[in-house]
Curated annotation (Swiss-Prot):
GO terms for biological process: carbohydrate derivative metabolic process; chloroplast organization; FAD metabolic process; response to high light intensity; riboflavin biosynthetic process. This is Riboflavin biosynthesis protein PYRR, chloroplastic. Gene3D superfamilies: Cytidine Deaminase, domain 2, Dihydrofolate Reductase, subunit A, YbiA-like. InterPro entries: CMP_dCMP_dom, Cytidine_deaminase-like, DHFR-like_dom_sf, Eubact_RibD, NADAR, RibD_C, RibDG_C, Riboflavin_Biosynth_HTPR.
Amino acid sequence: MPLPQPLLGGASPAPARAASSFLHPLLHTRHRVSTAPAAASSFVPASHSSHANDAMLLRRAADVADRSAGLTSPHPNFGCVIARPQLNTDSADSWVVGEGFLYAQGTPCAELLASQEAGEHARGGTAYLNLEPGDCFGDNTAVGSLVQAGITRVVVGLRHPLKHLRGKAIQALRNEGIQVDVVGEDLQSKLFKEALKSCLTVNAPLLYRAAFHVPFSVLKYAMTADGKIAASSGHASWISGKASRGRVFELRGRSDAVIVGGNTVRFDDPRLTARHVKGHVPVRIVMSQSLNLPEEANLWNLNDAYTIVATQRGARRDFQRKLAMKGVEVVEFDMLNPRAVMSYCYDRGYLAVLWECGGTLAASAISASVIHKVYAFWAPKIIGGLNAPTPVGELGMSQMTQAINLIDVSYEQIDRDMLMSGFIEPIPDLSPVIPSVEEIPSIDPEVSPYETNIISFYKTWDIFGAFSNFSPHSIQMPDENGDYFTWPTVEHYYQAHKFVGVDNPQARDIVQEIKLAKSPEEAARIGRTRQKGFPELVRTDWESTKIDVMYRAIKCKFSTYPHLTNMLLSTAGSVLVEASPHDLFWGGGREGEGLNYLGRLLMQLRSEILGTVPASAEVGEAD
């Protein structure tokens, strides 16, 4: 059965406009100058009411973008609101004909969902985007969706903060004759101040990651009215009330990982889960130099969540082996400190990290400039105690004038408690650092700028993110019955085939569950947990066939989307590495110790397309 040739990366065919220059703008843009004067980046005066409506709808787009919080792991938050003014009402809210948001990495983009909801009502309308499109490098569905929907104007809150994506979608839209107004450039009214703040806040993790090359880090603690986080004995359950603890669960759900120190494990034995049945569960990280930790602890139970122990190189190798037997990942550092751990979290692709540690580790993290925001829960209790611990240990400050003043402070009463939050480091606004079109790099599929370089890929929004199994590119491949089925991503296909062909109703149920997974993240979680919990349901030949299963899937993906093939060919001469620091089979590993089979399969496919190796060659023979 021939495979379809989609017009757009991941999008279903839709009524086409006359020109098709939008098909692959991210691949072929070569410093083109827009031929549409109306779409040029020049300020056009508008009425006060028009600006007010634009600002309100842009804030709504930012609110919509935040709807996946806690449901999936942190990712760039995209929201799209499509509106058309109605003659019978002045309420901008009633003008909305469609809206959508990015649910998770590798899922349909906000612009496509909003366009589908609006249908024909989108034609001639305005699309409000809190962030310039760019949820997957190499995929141009967002731009194509707006063009095909007949959108005539786009209002953008922020340019994309990542350099390899910044300005490209905006230029592609303008090249299609669509008017694009960017807050702070084309729209400079004071009315947009709050709208811009909303756009910055909803993507604070992405902005901090782009600016500082570490995840957005939040320090959270609960303390008594006299500033204690525990009694002198170390007992700390509970300082804050149930409602405040519920808010903490929300903070965890918004984080890739939760970090604690060894004392927290020894004294509190926490679980550090988000306490919900479905949704995102953060990784738990324990920092311990000595590894003087209990052999039995809630954090070693991986049924709740995954756990990483970060320690000094060489510490208690016998205990490391015991943790590894339980499935706990142990990561050694030459110098264990907050900055090193945050660099490691950055390499894992984390956007947001929550610190729930004691005062000593909190002080070290603040001193290392890796804490960006503080959430302090005050409880109306007094515990006293000369030796009772406080939220932050020694910072080396002797005068009050040296104190760190929090920025953009807010207060909220939560039942009997008070929540104070504020930033140590303000949210970076990268909008002043905007390259001209001539400075925006392009990818020419005909000429490779790489020779023998190593090209890394991992998260979909990173450069070459379309090489990831999580990229939003569906494939048509046979299912367990031999019938062609549209798998949402390569990851869905791969995880399901762990159980395909097993003569057991439970295995068949797992395949169906993975098929229906809303995101590749969810598909991976189902496949991995079922494989671990029910090894008898995994096909007996899985270890010998999984490489072939993966190769069939990625080969289908690249043959279905020609622009991805062009991108792959543009890397000729370079080594491709999946930059996973923890997956030592498919990825390259933290220090290059990984087998990098995904990168090797992509290089084999590249060589096969170029005709340098036969299709039957083993993966180990790939370039």
